Design a protein with these regions (language model features):
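Extended, hydrophobic alpha-helical segments in both membrane/secreted and soluble proteins
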Residues: 323, 330-337, 341, 377, ...
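Active-site proximal loops enriched in glycine and acidic residues that flank catalytic Cys/His/Asp
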Residues: 201, 212, 233-235, 262, ...
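Terminal amphipathic helices with adjacent charged low-complexity linkers/tails
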Residues: 264-279, 325-362
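Phosphate/ATP-binding catalytic cores across multiple sugar-kinase/actin-like superfamilies
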Residues: 192-195, 298-319, 332, 337-340, ...
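Cofactor-binding active-site loop characterized by glycine-rich and histidine/acidic residues
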Residues: 34-87, 335, 340-346, 357-409
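Conserved short alpha-helical segments that host acidic/polar catalytic motifs at enzyme active sites
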Residues: 1-253, 259-322, 326-327
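PRPP-dependent phosphoribosyltransferase catalytic core
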Residues: 190, 205-207, 212, 219, ...
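Hydrophobic alpha-helical segments characteristic of transmembrane helices
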Residues: 148-152, 307-308, 314-346, 364, ...
Length: 564
């Protein structure tokens, strides 16, 4: 149910409480590339149809694992959207670090970005470790594993040979498993972490945890029932899978860890100092599932807030306009836009009709034009594939967008204005390479693309990472304008200032890149974006209208992560 969160790859890990001699207690499967989720589901479903033939005794013992290897007691799943690194199976979560005991074995998955991976790597070196690879995922795995090892040694020292309990062998291993404190482990491991994250982890003996960054940048939700505990990045997914009421699913408080012991004991506790919340807004605009009622209401309102600007841009041409949306995730905001625009136009018509009646100038032939619905809504663009091009890998995105859209013909009279609501216009690749070209075949006079998100001007290194500034269409538009106005020297000035800042206080950063945008007002940049989105073969005029940051903040005041 969360396949919307990533399509580069998928993985599942499971803990098996009962296992035969020499058999693995942790099982893992990962797949990458096209069809990865279907392939993964086939792997983990292996043998499930034979489970019904087992006796109760066999179900309670290790026999079920030989029949169905992924039938376990604790499971961890992940869908990969790779912001950095590769897209192979080796990069898919969960990652696994095997220890010589179950309590030292860790499986980890997460939605996250660490902004200081290099500093964290240096910290591991100071611990005397020799980590292999410098990816932020590997570094986090190594750091948690290190302090998990420390925790094991502390308990062994307190309970092992020579202590008052003087335990050894299996008795000592069991006591270590009982006493492991994952809150304490994560308190130590998370020192110096800087980023946004939601991590889930499994230990080989069956303990599990879920931890969230202190600013709440990445979302996390928990459903607790008498017989199980479940957690996910999205509330709507939990509600659908377990048929649970929305009010039964609670947010994992930012800065908290949910610890689930093998015994079933549950603890939620802070593990890192609290910070002012900055929940990511782009999660709500684009990434999350739209069937969450709160997200549905927010997306409707984002569309509604754009209606006055859209009608102002259309002017007298509103009767010649057709409203639609692209991609599918923009449908709810488009509905909000159409509703609000219809309401405003009807109010204008009612005022005009009242004035005509009051002044005695009303004529019968005017009434039809004033009372008939004015805002026309059609589904014009259709995706041939259920793929989200924004989260496709760079290598495949261009080929993908060329063929992913088609249009409904004979709905739009030639010379019309198309109002296309998009949830966000970030790189502009899909619009330029596919959507504008295919909509142009309908012979409109102009296409007005309306973005429910503001201009994306900066990398969001803490949230949904869009890590290469030079690919943003807003940045390319600003650079194009600087070049046109003979101000290209500003780019070098900003680069020098940014490089100097690398050696300064990291806790007092200055956004020097804002000077590039500050040379022009938002409307001028939007006009240049429209130019960049227009392919050479297009015959229609292309225009762009963006949501304001103020209206975005008013729509979702509890989500203050606006880096736009």
């Amino acid at each position: 149910k969360q396949r919307n969160r990533g399509q580069d790859g998928a993985g599942v890990g499971v803990v098996r409480f009962e296992h035969g001699r020499g058999e693995p207690y942790l099982a893992r499967a990962r797949r990458a590339g096209p069809g990865n989720l279907d392939q993964l589901l086939a792997v983990i479903s292996e043998g499930m149809d034979q489970v019904n033939d087992l006796s109760d005794a066999e179900l309670d013992g290790a026999k079920r694992h030989s029949v169905a290897p992924f039938l376990g007691e604790v499971m961890l799943g992940h869908l990969r959207y790779g912001t950095h690194g590769g897209h192979s199976e080796d990069h898919c979560h969960p990652l696994y670090r095997r220890g010589d005991r179950r309590s030292r074995s860790l499986m980890l998955a997460g939605n996250f970005n660490m902004t200081n991976a290099s500093a964290l790597f240096d910290q591991l070196l100071r611990y005397g470790l020799d980590p292999i690879g410098e990816s932020d995922t590997q570094i986090v795995l190594e750091k948690i594993s290190h302090f998990l090892e420390v925790e094991n040694r502390l308990i062994e020292h307190a309970c092992g040979e020579g202590s008052l309990q003087n335990l050894s062998g299996r008795a000592l291993a069991s006591e270590i498993e009982n006493q492991i404190d994952l809150v304490r482990v994560l308190e130590k491991a998370s020192t110096m972490w800087d980023g946004g994250w939601l991590f889930g982890g499994l230990l080989g003996h069956g303990d599990a945890f879920l931890c969230r960054d202190a600013r709440g940048i990445r979302p996390g939700f928990v459903l607790e029932r008498e017989s199980f505990e479940a957690a996910a990045s999205e509330r709507a997914a939990l509600a659908t899978v377990f048929n649970a009421p929305m009010d039964e699913i609670v947010e994992l408080t930012p800065g908290e860890v949910l610890e689930i012991k093998r015994s079933g004991a549950i603890r939620r506790e802070a593990y890192t100092p609290q910070q002012p919340p900055t929940r990511c807004t782009f999660e709500r605009i684009y990434f999350s599932r739209g069937n969450d009622p709160d997200i549905h209401r927010e997306r409707l309102e984002l569309g509604e807030r754009l209606a006055p600007q859209v009608l102002e841009r259309l002017g007298d041409d509103v009767h010649n306009a057709v409203f639609s949306f692209v991609p599918n995730t923009a449908e709810t905001a488009a509905e909000g836009l159409a509703r609000a625009a219809t309401k405003l136009v009807r109010q204008q018509h009612a005022d005009q009709l009242w004035n005509d009646v009051s002044g005695g100038t009303a004529k019968r032939e005017q009434l039809d034009a004033l009372v008939e619905p004015t805002i026309r809504v059609e589904r014009l663009a259709h995706k041939d594939q259920r793929m989200r091009t924004f989260i496709a890998s760079d290598a495949t995105r261009r080929d993908l967008v060329l063929h992913v859209y088609d249009v409904t013909r004979d709905l739009v009279p030639p010379g019309s204005t198309l109002v296309m609501l998009d949830d966000s216009i970030v790189r502009g690749t899909t619009l330029r390479e596919s959507i504008v070209a295919i909509l142009d075949r309908l012979e409109p006079a102009r296409i007005l693309f309306v973005s429910s998100a503001p201009q994306i001007r900066y990398p969001d290194c803490y949230g949904i990472d869009m890590s290469q500034l030079g690919r943003f269409v807003a940045f390319r538009a600003a650079v194009s304008l600087l070049d046109e106005h003979g101000k290209s020297d500003l780019l070098e000035e900003v680069e020098v200032a940014c490089r100097e800042q690398l050696a300064s206080d990291p806790h007092a950063p200055v956004n020097h890149v804002s000077k590039i945008y500050g040379a022009f007002d938002d409307a001028i940049i939007s006009q240049r974006i429209a130019t960049l989105l227009t392919p050479p073969t297009a015959k229609c005029k292309v225009e762009v209208l963006y949501q304001s940051v103020a209206d975005l903040q008013a729509t979702m005041p509890e989500h203050t992560g606006t880096w736009y």
